[in-house]
């Protein structure tokens, strides 16, 4: 290749080593300087006035490459600045100092752009000079290894521009020291350079904080996450090596506590508690319970102090006192009592102008109802209607406990009856005022004075004769003297000064409860203090839950109930008993604890009152000859009060030989599980105002289970009494039928001794029972083997006739002995 040949420009490539360029250009001398970042050497390029076409083309390409690198660095700087701005926005920096830092970064960007623009103008001047030059360019490289000379040769303002020179990289790669060598090796060694822009480095958290810090020099250094992690692990190892100081606590121990609960209360390991129990000779796991004494020993051995509490303390949250200034006047609660069909429900119909009796079978109220009547003057009276039948005595007694006034209804044409006397006794026991309403005065031929005289016998003395009981003749059907009855109620209520606290948590009593399909458990309650609201947590007996819905006696939904207001609520988990007290608690955990405590008490009480079997009964039962028979029953009813009354009445039936066993009693229709239980135990299902479902009925027919339906309670009781009477053993009674005197003894071959006798009284029957008396002492009792009249066998011989008698398996008979004849008669027993 000759110098005159035209050398085609080829693309230059960068070498393996990375170069950082601090370039300065002198327009007068045509000198450029390059700095190698790795070797810290300075490469100085001097241009002469002469040049060639090859050099010019290389210079053009080099200038274009320099311009490309400058543009790339400019774009890279702008991109990094935008990243910093976004990071600052995402971290939501509200510090004004940080905002000022961003403004500083923006100013730095503007200054950098202003520094790059003059450099671009210098490149244009250099390009023009290179186009006019015709001489060769002498390239000499002066390597300066002393680092101290670099700052003096490189202008300070060019330090902020970082450019990688492709020429320096090419020379470093191929070992070219002069431009002549470059011309010689242009065809063989020079390769077109490829511009490789480095990917932007990922901004670290520490770099971001340094950039955004107030210290412009960046001297504030943050610790890396790895160093923080190492410091934390070191601190943990240091703490682990130190023995933790044990904390001793005051432990509250109830009557019974679980091993795991005791360990949690002391903040001890369960294994340590079990070890202490093993030292005491007790083997228990974490789920088992121990008594309070054992728990106290364990806690004391582990260094804790003990505070003993009674299990009944869980009910202390239900106790609250009312302040006098919070009391407000409330409506009176009146209970209506009396005998069957004396007009109690009709009286309520007249008072509240609704037909309640239409829904009652035969006019007999089957369960308690609570109603609120508002009078013309705006005052209200709450009535509780208790059934009059004797089977509901327990329900009636509960009604008397929650009432302020008792109205005893007596029919003028019927007078005082058994249930009337019982109602009087309940009212006296409750210590509440009594008003006697003599009903049905509209009927002819009545004698009110006779009724008053009967009341005097039971110490019910009217005001007209100096007593303290108001006796008012009324007619519920004709609505006669109802206003006088209302005035008497309000007068007594005013004298009693009835007040209650309407503030705070509600409390009261359960009137009735039942299960209705599609609605769940429905409970009728009477609020006695406080205000009951929706979503309150209520506990009644062993039942608890959240109040989901409240309706008043008219069927309207309400959101709160004040004292003396009866409401029906939904939301309890089970059916409470009529007469159970209800309270409001803070949360469901408290309600659950109280319910569990009450269930344990009821279970212990049931076990303690269970009848003990005598040794004789156990032997008889083991041998299969037990005289005690059982009648298993399953009772289902429409409301809890009816089921409870039926159970109580049946258990009171007197019988020493028949044990009535109620396997299950509940509210709601008969289910398949009831049928399965009845089949397994050979029980009778007694249904009161409920029916069996289709599936339960099919199962009962298949298993041949007896289901009996009733709608009146005393019919049910009479039927069960008849069944129990049929199970009783009949009474065997001896009936004397005659006697004979032995006058002569005959010995007959193959027959034995025959007593020739004379019938002195009654008749003698063959096969009847006989007693042989000698000197009025019974020496034998058996049966007649033979009865003959002369040589003929006869069935009986009457008084005044002679006969021959032979005894079964007995021949020690003498003349003068007396034979008594009797029959055994079985009689059916009744309860």
Curated annotation (Swiss-Prot):
One of the essential components for the initiation of protein synthesis. Protects formylmethionyl-tRNA from spontaneous hydrolysis and promotes its binding to the 30S ribosomal subunits. Also involved in the hydrolysis of GTP during the formation of the 70S ribosomal complex. It comes from Rickettsia rickettsii (strain Sheila Smith). Residues 439-442 are annotated as: G4. Residues 363-367 are annotated as: G2. GO terms for molecular function: GTP binding; GTPase activity; guanosine tetraphosphate binding; translation initiation factor activity. This is Translation initiation factor IF-2. Residues 385-388 are annotated as: G3. Keywords: Cytoplasm, GTP-binding, Initiation factor, Nucleotide-binding, Protein biosynthesis. Belongs to the TRAFAC class translation factor GTPase superfamily. Classic translation factor GTPase family. IF-2 subfamily. The keyword Cytoplasm applies. GTP binds at residues 338-345, 385-389, 439-442. The lineage of its organism: Bacteria, Pseudomonadati, Pseudomonadota, Alphaproteobacteria, Rickettsiales. The gene is infB.
């Amino acid at each position: 290749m000759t110098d005159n040949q035209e050398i085609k420009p080829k693309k230059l490539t960068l070498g393996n080593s990375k170069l950082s360029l601090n370039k300065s250009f002198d327009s007068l001398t045509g000198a450029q300087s390059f700095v190698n970042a790795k070797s810290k050497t300075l490469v100085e390029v001097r241009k002469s006035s002469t040049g060639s076409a090859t050099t010019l083309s290389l210079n053009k390409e080099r200038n274009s490459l320099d311009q490309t690198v400058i543009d790339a660095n400019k774009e890279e700087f702008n991109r990094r600045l935008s990243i910093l701005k976004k990071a600052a926005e995402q971290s939501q920096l509200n510090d004004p100092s940080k905002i000022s830092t961003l403004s500083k970064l923006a100013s730095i960007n503007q200054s950098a752009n202003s520094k790059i623009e003059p450099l671009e103008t210098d490149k244009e001047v250099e390009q023009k000079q290179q186009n006019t030059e015709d001489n060769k360019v002498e390239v000499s490289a002066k390597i300066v290894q002393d680092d101290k000379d670099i700052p003096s040769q490189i202008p300070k303002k060019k330090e902020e521009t970082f450019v990688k020179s492709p020429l320096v990289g090419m020379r470093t790669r191929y070992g070219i020291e002069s431009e002549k060598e470059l011309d010689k090796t242009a065809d063989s060694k020079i390769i077109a350079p490829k511009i490789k822009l480095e990917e932007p480095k990922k901004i670290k958290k520490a770099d971001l904080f340094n950039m955004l810090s107030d210290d412009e020099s960046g001297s504030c250094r943050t610790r890396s996450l790895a160093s923080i992690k190492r410091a934390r692990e070191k601190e943990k190892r240091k703490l682990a090596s130190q023995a933790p100081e044990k904390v001793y606590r005051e432990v509250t121990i109830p009557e019974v506590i679980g091993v795991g609960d005791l360990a949690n209360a002391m903040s001890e390991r369960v294994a340590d508690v079990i070890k202490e129990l093993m030292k005491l000779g007790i083997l228990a796991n974490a789920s088992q319970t121990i008594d309070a004494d054992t728990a106290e020993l364990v806690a004391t051995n582990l260094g804790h102090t003990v505070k003993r509490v009674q299990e009944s303390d869980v009910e202390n949250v239900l106790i609250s006192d009312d302040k006098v200034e919070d009391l407000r006047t409330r409506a009176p609660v009146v209970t209506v009592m009396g005998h069957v069909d004396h007009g109690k429900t009709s009286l309520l119909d007249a008072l509240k102008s609704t037909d309640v009796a239409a829904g009652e079978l035969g006019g007999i109220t089957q369960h308690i109802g609570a109603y609120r009547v508002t009078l013309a003057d705006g005052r209200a009276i709450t009535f509780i209607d208790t059934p009059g039948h004797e089977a509901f005595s327990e329900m009636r007694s509960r009604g008397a406990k929650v009432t302020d006034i008792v109205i005893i209804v007596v029919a003028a044409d019927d007078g005082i009856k058994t249930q009337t006397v019982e109602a009087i006794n309940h009212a006296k026991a409750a210590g509440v005022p009594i008003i006697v309403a003599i009903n049905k005065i509209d009927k002819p031929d009545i004698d009110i004075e006779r009724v008053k005289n009967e009341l005097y016998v039971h110490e019910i003395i009217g005001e007209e004769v100096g007593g303290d009981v108001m006796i008012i003749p009324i007619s519920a059907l004709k609505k006669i003297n109802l206003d006088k009855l209302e005035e008497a109620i309000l007068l007594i209520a005013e004298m009693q000064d009835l007040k209650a606290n309407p503030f705070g948590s509600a409390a009261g009593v359960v009137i009735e409860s039942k299960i209705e399909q599609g609605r769940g458990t429905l409970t009728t309650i009477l609020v006695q203090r406080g205000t009951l609201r929706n979503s309150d947590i209520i506990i009644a007996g062993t039942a608890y839950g959240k109040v989901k819905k409240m309706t008043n006696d008219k069927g309207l939904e309400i959101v709160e109930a004040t004292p003396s207001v009866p409401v029906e609520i939904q939301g309890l988990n089970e059916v409470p008993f009529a007469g159970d007290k209800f309270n409001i608690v803070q949360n469901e955990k408290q309600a659950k604890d109280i319910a569990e405590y009450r269930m344990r008490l009821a279970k212990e009480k049931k076990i303690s009152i269970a009848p003990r079997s005598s040794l004789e009964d156990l032997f008889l039962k083991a041998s299969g000859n037990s005289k005690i028979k059982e009648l298993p029953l399953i009772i289902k009813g429409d409301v809890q009060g009816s089921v409870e009354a039926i159970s109580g009445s049946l258990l009171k039936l007197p019988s020493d030989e028949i044990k009535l066993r109620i396997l299950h009693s509940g509210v709601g229709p008969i289910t398949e599980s009831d049928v399965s239980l009845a089949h397994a135990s050979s029980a009778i299902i007694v249904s009161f105002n409920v029916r069996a479902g289709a599936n339960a009925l099919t199962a009962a027919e298949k298993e041949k289970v007896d289901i009996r339906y009733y709608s009146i309670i005393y019919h049910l009781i009479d039927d069960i009494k008849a069944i129990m009477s049929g199970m009783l053993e009949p009474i065997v009674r001896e009936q004397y039928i005659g006697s004979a005197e032995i006058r002569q003894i005959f010995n007959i071959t193959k027959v034995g001794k025959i007593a020739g006798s004379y019938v002195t009284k009654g008749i003698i029957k063959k096969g009847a029972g006989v007693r042989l008396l000698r000197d009025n002492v019974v020496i034998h009792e058996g049966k007649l083997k033979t009865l003959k009249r002369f040589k003929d066998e006869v069935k009986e011989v009457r008084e005044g006739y002679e006969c021959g008698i032979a005894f079964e398996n007995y021949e020690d008979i003498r003349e003068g002995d007396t034979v008594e004849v009797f029959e055994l008669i079985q009689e059916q027993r009744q309860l």
